[in-house]
Structure formats: structure tokens, C-alpha cells
A protein has these predicted regions:
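C-terminal substrate-binding/active-site "lid" region of AdoMet-derived donor-dependent transferases
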Residues: 155-218
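Short, basic/glycine-rich phosphate-binding loops at helix/coil junctions
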Residues: 36-44, 144
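Conserved SAM-binding loop and adjacent beta-strand
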Residues: 46-60
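Glycine-/small-residue-rich active-site loops that bind phosphorylated ligands and cofactors
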Residues: 48, 151, 184
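Segments forming oxygen-rich coordination pockets for charged ligands
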Residues: 27-28, 44-46
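N-terminal auxiliary segments of SAM/dcSAM-dependent transferases
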Residues: 1-39
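The AdoMet/dcAdoMet-binding core of the Class I SAM-like
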Residues: 58, 62-170, 187, 209-211
Length: 218
């Protein structure tokens, strides 16, 4: 795990400080900064991880604080640096057996480099496309995080009824899905909400700026 100097940690409370830039297999440049003593992963168009301050998981997990002690297994689709797991570990002292899936090997490598996520030797990083992984997965999970973005867009398959049904099938009884999503229109939001409500027994919508976070109970 990369260590950040104390001087940079202190300076990061004033403005973001660049730690490195890395170009992935697809030619996209990813920037790693430390900001407010949190590691932040970004591209020119989006923030993909921001330590314990990553709203797509800090807000839903706070909402689920009474459920968190029961979370023994976690699947993350769209890992980024692994902020979802980082928040579980650092804010809630919870270390579930975890599978972190991302299509981008560069992001998985950065996750291992900057977040010390595997202290309990129960975390696996897998480079795979999310729908392919789900199609071939035979495990069950207490918690699934769905955070798939291409810049500021969510792939169409991630909002499809077929894919959401498959995720439902990967949850244990009383398992929970956290779905971070942006919509292009009110109509699209209504369609996706109807799909979720037709699959899961309880759906709660949380919001921060443009992002919608759905907490869906099996």
C-alpha cells in the first residue's frame, strides 16, 4: 500500500494534491489526489472514488447502520478504488468477505495500492465485465453494491429488468442492493423505479445532487 507523507496529508485540507496520474488500457487518464486526507480517484469528467467521503456509499450505508453488523458477504460491481468497502471497514468496523469487480484492471491495481482493504485476507479483486460476472456467479451475498458508470452515464444493461432480477437472485434472504444511478429524464427514473419495486420487497430512494441511491431489500 502506498504511503502518503504527513506534509501532503496536512496540505490536502487546503486543496487537492496530486499523487499520480495513470493511463489505463483504454487510453483514459486517471488522476489520484489526496483531498481532505481522503484518496480521490477522478477523470476530467467524473469522480469515481473519494475515500470515506464517497457519497454513493457513505449516505446509503449510514441509512443501513442497523443492518451493517449482519453483513458477512459483499459484492461490489464497479469498484473504483473500493470506497464502498473502505467505508464499511473504516466507519463501521465491518470486514465482510468481499468480491470487488471492475472491467478496468488499472483501477483494481490502484485500489490495492492506495487502500489497505485486505487486512483480514478475505477480499478478492476480479477484472471482468459486470454482466458476464453476474451470469457466471454462483455465490450469494448479504450486500451488493451496483456503481457502474462510464463517465457520467450508467450502462443501459445495469438498469434493465433482466440484470436487476439476476442481482436479486444473488442476494441472500433479506439481502440488500445499493444502486447508484443517474437518469437522463424523469420518465427514465419512473421506469427504473417501477422495475425495482416489481422485483424487491422494499425500495428506498436517497438523493445527493444529481445522484440517486436506491436501497433495495430482497
Amino acid at each position: 500500500m502506498s504511503k502518503v507523507s504527513l506534509i501532503k496529508k496536512i496540505g490536502s485540507y487546503v486543496y487537492p494534491l496530486l499523487l499520480e496520474e495513470r493511463t489505463d488500457y483504454f487510453g483514459k487518464v486517471h488522476r489520484i489526489d489526496i483531498y481532505r486526507n481522503q484518496i480521490m480517484l477522478s477523470t476530467p469528467s467524473a469522480i469515481y472514488s473519494f475515500g470515506k467521503s464517497y457519497y454513493p456509499f457513505s449516505i446509503p450505508l449510514k441509512h443501513l447502520k442497523n443492518d451493517i453488523p449482519k453483513i458477512k458477504s459483499f459484492l461490489m460491481l464497479g469498484t473504483g478504488l473500493g470506497s464502498g468497502l473502505h467505508i464499511l471497514q473504516q466507519q463501521f468496523n465491518t470486514y465482510p468477505k468481499t468480491t470487488l469487480v471492475d472491467l478496468n484492471q488499472t483501477l483494481l491495481d490502484l485500489s490495492k495500492q492506495y487502500f489497505d482493504l485486505n487486512t483480514h485476507h478475505n477480499v478478492e479483486w476480479i477484472c471482468d465485465e459486470a454482466s458476464h460476472f453476474v451470469d457466471n456467479c454462483h455465490e450469494k451475498y448479504n450486500l451488493i453494491g451496483l456503481d457502474l458508470f462510464i463517465d457520467m452515464s450508467v450502462p443501459l444493461f445495469a438498469k434493465s429488468e433482466q440484470f436487476l432480477l439476476k442481482l436479486h437472485g444473488l442476494l441472500n434472504q433479506n439481502g440488500i442492493l445499493i444502486f447508484n444511478v443517474l437518469f437522463s429524464s424523469i420518465n427514465e427514473m419512473k421506469i427504473v423505479e417501477e422495475r425495482l419495486e416489481g422485483i424487491y420487497k422494499e425500495v428506498t430512494r436517497l438523493k445527493h445532487d444529481r445522484n440517486n441511491f436506491y436501497v433495495c431489500r430482497r
